[in-house]
């Protein structure tokens, strides 16, 4: 009998410890996370709606941005509601199937965002370094392929890692020292040998980070070279400002994900990993629409119009 069959027959249950060691701050944390999740939902769905409604925003960059917002919304929705529930209930349990599903979908959207940001970096490279060929290179077909490829690779990575998690064995009741069903804490809760699953996760994480960062760093090295060749200071500043939002987003995202998923032994610093997980899963999906909208006048103007219209008719 395979381990996955034993798991299904014994129906293991995971107990998410999360912030159970700090009961005095659970209510404040609930309110904070509820506010953050509300901002995340409104910000990302609002971004998608605004881009669809405003014809001025039917650009290639906004096409990628709308999919980035969709990815952030889906990722946050997979994780945050369960986190909020566990802050107010006495028994912080999640079924084995529920835990695996949470990891599976979180992995899909996490990997998708990694390569979506890389595709956006390539878009900025073409816009700055090859402006006359921009519409030719960044064709509708190529943009669709870049987005579809990001989603597809996210699904492939998730299915591989999920398959090997299903091959592990767990006790009927297992404690997980985190607030989400992350790969590292799931394998640490298994009593079977997780070596293959751990190595695969490490290899996939390294491959995803290195390959996406190569695209991003190469793109921005060429962008900076082009900017420095410009004679006009105002031209350099204007060109750089078009990349500032994306630079901020990738710095926050990749800095956090490198720390979380490229550390061979996260057990040695579980508290730090938990804090970083909170930032990665809760804060980043909220920050992305704020980062991009603050520097885009068309998005700001459209948002103001929607708010004014809402206030007038309600």
UniProtKB/Swiss-Prot annotation:
Q: Which residues cross the membrane?
A: 28-48, 57-77, 102-122, 142-162, 199-219, 240-260, 274-294
Protein's membrane topology: Multi-pass membrane protein
* Cell compartment(s), UniProt: Cell membrane
A molecular function annotated in GO for this UniProt entry is: odorant binding
The answer to keyword Acetylation applying to this record is: no
The GO biological-process annotations, alphabetized, read as: G protein-coupled receptor signaling pathway; sensory perception of smell
Give GO cellular component annotations, separated by semicolons. Answer: plasma membrane
Q: Which InterPro entries match?
A: GPCR_Rhodpsn (IPR000276), GPCR_Rhodpsn_7TM (IPR017452), Olfact_rcpt (IPR000725)
Looking up Pfam families in the UniProt record yields: 7tm_4 (PF13853)
Membrane topology (Cytoplasmic): 49-56, 123-141, 220-239, 295-314
Q: Does the keyword Lipid biosynthesis apply?
A: no
Glycosylated sites: 7
- Cross-referenced CDD domains, in alphabetical order? 7tmA_OR5D-like
PROSITE patterns, per the entry: G_PROTEIN_RECEP_F1_1, G_PROTEIN_RECEP_F1_2
Describe the task this protein carries out: Odorant receptor.
> What is the protein's given name?
Olfactory receptor 5D13
Species in which this protein is naturally found: Homo sapiens (Human)
């Amino acid at each position: 009998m395979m381990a996955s069959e034993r798991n299904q027959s014994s129906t293991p249950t995971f107990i998410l410890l999360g912030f159970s060691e700090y009961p005095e701050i659970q209510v404040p944390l609930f309110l904070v996370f509820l506010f953050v999740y509300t901002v995340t939902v409104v910000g990302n769905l609002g971004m998608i709606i605004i881009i669809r409604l405003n014809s001025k925003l039917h650009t290639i960059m906004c096409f990628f941005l709308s999919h980035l917002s969709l990815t952030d919304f889906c990722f946050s929705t997979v994780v945050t509601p369960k986190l909020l529930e566990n802050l107010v209930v006495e028994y912080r349990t999640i079924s084995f199937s529920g835990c695996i599903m949470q990891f599976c979908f979180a992995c899909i959207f996490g990997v998708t965002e990694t390569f979506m940001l890389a595709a956006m970096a390539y878009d900025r490279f073409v816009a700055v370094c090859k402006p006359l060929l921009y519409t030719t290179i960044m064709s509708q077909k190529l943009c669709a392929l870049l987005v579809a490829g990001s989603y597809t690779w996210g699904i492939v990575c998730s299915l591989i890692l999920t398959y090997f998690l299903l091959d592990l064995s767990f006790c009927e009741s297992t404690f997980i020292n985190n607030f989400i069903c992350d790969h590292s804490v799931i394998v640490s809760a298994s009593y079977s040998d997780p070596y293959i699953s751990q190595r695969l996760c490490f290899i996939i994480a390294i491959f995803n980070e290195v390959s996406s960062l190569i695209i991003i760093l190469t793109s921005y090295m060429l962008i900076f070279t082009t900017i420095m060749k410009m004679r006009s200071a105002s031209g350099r500043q204007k060109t750089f400002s078009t990349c500032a939002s994306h630079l901020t987003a990738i710095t926050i995202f990749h800095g956090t994900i490198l720390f979380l998923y490229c550390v061979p032994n996260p057990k040695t610093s579980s508290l730090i990993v938990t804090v970083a997980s909170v930032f990665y899963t809760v804060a980043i999906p909220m920050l992305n629409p704020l980062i991009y909208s603050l520097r885009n006048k068309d998005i700001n103007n459209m948002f103001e119009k929607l708010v004014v219209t809402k206030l007038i008719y309600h």
